[in-house]
Amino acid sequence: EGDAAAGEKVSKKCLACHTFDQGGANKVGPNLFGVFENTAAHKDNYAYSESYTEMKAKGLTWTEANLAAYVKNPKAFVLEKSGDPKAKSKMTFKLTKDDEIENVIAYLKTLK
């Protein structure tokens, strides 16, 4: 289990592209409030790529395992889960340290 307070600090690295507040604006990436245990591409007011809408159609949910794999390597995750060989992700930033990943996921779990 991660540490949500530590995860909130780590999430500051994500603020260039994401917001975390309920009802917060989308930026380059979607607002992440309520992402945990939600389906991929769940924000109605964000223009997701076809790869993400394909993952949604396949029923992909943002579980701990999926979030961890995604933040480690977004492009590889989207390629694998969407089944689209041309899949892309705007997210180029990666979290590489397991403790940071666990902490960010713990923080995302509190945003509901």
UniProtKB/Swiss-Prot annotation:
Q: Name one Pfam family in it.
A: Cytochrom_C
Where along this sequence does the record place binding of heme c? Answer: C14, C17, H18, M91
Q: How is it modified after translation?
A: Binds 1 heme c group covalently per subunit.
**GO-annotated molecular function:** electron transfer activity; heme binding; metal ion binding
**What are its GO biological-process terms?**
photosynthesis
Instruction: State the source organism's domain of life.
Output: Bacteria
Q: Which UniProt keywords apply?
A: Electron transport, Heme, Iron, Metal-binding, Photosynthesis, Transport
InterPro entries under this entry? Cyt_c-like_dom (IPR009056), Cyt_c-like_dom_sf (IPR036909), Cyt_c_1A/1B (IPR002327)
Its annotated function is as follows: Cytochrome c2 is found mainly in purple, non-sulfur, photosynthetic bacteria where it functions as the electron donor to the oxidized bacteriochlorophyll in the photophosphorylation pathway. However, it may also have a role in the respiratory chain and is found in some non-photosynthetic bacteria.
Similarity remark: Belongs to the cytochrome c family.
User: What PANTHER family does the record point to?
Assistant: CYTOCHROME C
Q: What is this protein called?
A: Cytochrome c2
This chain's source organism reads Rhodospirillum rubrum
